[in-house]
């Protein structure tokens, strides 16, 4: 009887909360608004369209919402609040600054609220609903055509448009109430679930876990916001990635890299993303082809796998606490998911490899621990595909395979002698299936084009496509500044001490954005460096005090793998191209997190928890303070 009473009370409280939220939404309705301007022709260059919309009566700088025009379409979205007869949309700047490439023509303007079209204006209606300031000169034609005569052209909504914009719409209201209510409910359930996971912990543990949850959710929100709004040209090599992704909109098989069909995918280096085995471009292309927004087309896949990674971290917030250290130690991890780069898929696969190692009941650990069962056939296949993606990744992620090899070897050597044989056979099966799948894929997708000489073809094509300073045949002294330092006579000591190698490497690991142009103040990197040293020192100290030989061997394996990671970066910068980029260091997060997972009762270690709290807060601050202001086009300057 008491249980029934409690259940009834819960339903009453839930109904009361829903009714209260309904009343609040009647006064102030959450509205996700999208304004779409379609130009008759794609404006020349990187043109930014800005909508000024906000709660105030007058226009302010904070009202700016901007997007780059892609393929003749500017699609600007923001979270709005509808109340009374207030019209939040105050003006539209069709271009960000002076435009001297001729007249511009807008064919249509559409306004969606919560996904529902509420305004759709064609050419003849646009003139009725919008006027221009003195820096917009309209033509006398029947089209909405105008010339830009100054640096601040503005389209101003008329009173008729404002009335149209503020009209009520029942479906918009209901969707705003329902979706926002569900999001609040989801957040409340997440908080409740986290508190249940740590119900036996101290107040410090409970508060920090809620902070970690906020950090993960905050990272997801900022990454999504940046991905949907940042221009392609602000991110490293994204136009080259875009060309490779768009190819797979209409193709399943990789192209012959000598084909003219992929000419647009070659940068000055003469290397195309189609040279790679990486499946990122295929996955992103096959998903993106169903969407019309240019940013969504090539970035949605990265956002999905980032969301999956965040979900796995939250789900394991206590059980596999070490996963938090991969996610919250540096905002550089978040950044590679906010634009389109194959590093995102490589990192995600490395993250799954770490999960397979530290999760007691993972596919890998069950296959290695249990006697053969039929479901293990599926496990072998999925694990081989996982490892295969690391084979297809950038060379800097090969250390993940090296790390897996060392850890599994150490585990085998610490088994009883009679257990080593069966375990070794399982290792061979996994390695054999992985290599077999690699060979099958090559024979299907590459052998018909190149035989066994793909590397030779790559070198020939690079020679043909690269600009002079980047051609392999160009004399070293005439090569581009960053190329072939070794051949230019620069010693290893000079490379490491006279070119800010370590400074750039660390800063771009701890948080640097754009084409490595936007960084924090010096104090940020100093504090992060100290926190990383404390983290490493505390982890090694705890493991060493546990006095288990296997842990000491694992520390040695991690140290050696990290050293190889460093050597790969140094070698590339010395022999190929000077690129001390922190994204090449990101795999060490997996190795450090593995060691943290081996610490006894790591959940209760206040030092490690405090360090993670600090890096979480600093990472959020860095991405919000430097990343977003420089990666979205509201404040950035055109190149």
Model-derived segments and spans:
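Start-transfer (signal-anchor) and selected internal transmembrane alpha helices
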Residues: 1-30, 169-225, 413, 424-434, ...
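Transmembrane signal-anchor helices characteristic of membrane glycosylation enzymes that use polyprenol
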Residues: 17-30, 206-238, 247-253, 431-448, ...
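Membrane-interface anchor segments at the N-terminal boundary of transmembrane helices
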Residues: 166-178, 290-304, 493-566
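Transmembrane-helix motifs of polytopic, lipid-linked glycan transferases
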Residues: 189, 297-320, 352, 537
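Transmembrane-helix signature of polytopic, membrane-embedded enzymes
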Residues: 209-212, 296, 313-334
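Loop-to-helix entry region of an early transmembrane alpha helix in multi-pass inner-membrane enzymes
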Residues: 270-308
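Perimembrane helix-loop-helix junctions
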Residues: 356-370, 400-435
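Membrane-lumen/periplasm interface segments of specific transmembrane helices
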Residues: 406, 410, 423-535, 623-629
């Amino acid at each position: 009887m008491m249980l029934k009473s409690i259940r009834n009370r819960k339903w009453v409280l839930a109904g009361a909360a829903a009714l209260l939220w309904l009343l609040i939404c009647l006064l102030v309705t959450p509205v996700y608004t999208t304004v779409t301007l379609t130009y008759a022709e794609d404006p020349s260059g990187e043109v930014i369209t800005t909508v000024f919309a906000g709660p105030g009566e007058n226009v302010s700088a904070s009202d700016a919402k901007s997007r780059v025009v892609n393929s003749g379409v500017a699609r600007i979205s923001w979270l709005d609040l509808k109340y009374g007869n207030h019209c939040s949309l105050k003006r539209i700047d069709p271009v960000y600054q002076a435009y001297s490439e001729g007249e511009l023509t807008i064919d249509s303007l559409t306004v969606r609220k919560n996904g529902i079209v509420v305004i759709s204006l064609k050419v003849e209606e646009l003139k009725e609903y919008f006027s221009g300031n003195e820096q917009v000169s309209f033509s006398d034609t029947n089209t909405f055509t105008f010339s830009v005569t100054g640096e601040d052209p503005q389209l101003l909504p008329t009173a008729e448009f404002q009335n149209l914009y503020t009209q009520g719409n029942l479906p918009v209201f209901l969707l705003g109430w329902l979706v926002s209510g569900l999001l609040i409910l989801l957040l409340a359930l997440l908080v409740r679930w986290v508190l249940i996971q740590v119900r036996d912990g101290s107040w410090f543990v409970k508060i920090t876990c809620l902070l970690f949850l906020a950090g993960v959710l905050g990272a997801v929100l900022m990454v999504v916001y940046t991905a949907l709004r940042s221009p392609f040209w602000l991110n490293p090599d994204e136009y080259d990635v875009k060309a490779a992704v768009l190819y797979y909109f209409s193709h399943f098989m990789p192209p012959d890299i000598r084909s003219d069909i992929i000419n647009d995918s070659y940068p000055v280096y003469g290397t195309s993303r189609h040279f790679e085995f990486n499946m990122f471009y295929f996955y992103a292309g096959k998903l993106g082809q169903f969407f019309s927004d240019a940013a969504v087309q090539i970035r949605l896949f990265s956002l999905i796998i980032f969301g999956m990674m965040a979900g796995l971290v939250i789900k394991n917030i206590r059980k596999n606490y070490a996963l938090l250290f991969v996610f919250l130690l540096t905002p550089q991890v978040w950044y590679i998911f906010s634009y389109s780069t194959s590093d995102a898929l490589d990192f995600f696969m490395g993250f799954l490899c770490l999960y397979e190692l530290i999760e007691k009941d993972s596919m890998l650990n069950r296959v290695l621990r249990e006697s053969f069962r039929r479901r293990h056939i599926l496990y072998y296949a999925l694990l081989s595909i996982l490892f295969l993606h690391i084979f297809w990744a950038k060379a800097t992620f090969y250390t993940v395979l090296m790390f897996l090899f060392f850890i599994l070897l150490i585990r085998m050597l610490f088994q009883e002698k009679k257990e080593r044989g069966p375990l070794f056979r399982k290792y061979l099966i996994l390695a054999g299936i992985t290599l077999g799948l690699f060979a099958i894929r090559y024979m299907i997708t590459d052998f018909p084009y190149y035989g066994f000489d793909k590397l030779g073809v790559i070198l020939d094509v690079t020679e043909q496509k690269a600009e002079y300073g980047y051609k392999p045949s160009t004399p070293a002294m005439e090569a581009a500044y960053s190329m072939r330092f070794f051949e230019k006579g620069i010693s290893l000591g000079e490379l490491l001490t006279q070119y800010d190698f370590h400074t750039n490497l660390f800063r771009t690991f701890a948080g640097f954005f754009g084409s490595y142009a936007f960084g924090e103040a010096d104090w940020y990197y100093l504090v992060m460096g100290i926190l990383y040293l404390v983290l490493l020192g505390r982890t090694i100290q705890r493991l060493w005090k546990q006095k288990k030989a296997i842990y000491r061997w694992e520390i040695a394996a991690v140290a050696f793998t990290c050293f190889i990671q460093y050597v790969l970066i140094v070698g590339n910068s010395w022999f190929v191209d000077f690129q001390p980029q922190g994204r090449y260091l990101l795999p060490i997060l997996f190795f450090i997190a593995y060691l943290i997972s081996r610490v006894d009762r790591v959940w209760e270690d206040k030092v490690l928890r405090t360090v993670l709290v600090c890096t979480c807060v600093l990472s959020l601050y860095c991405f919000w303070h430097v990343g977003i202001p420089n990666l979205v086009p509201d404040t950035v300057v055109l190149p």
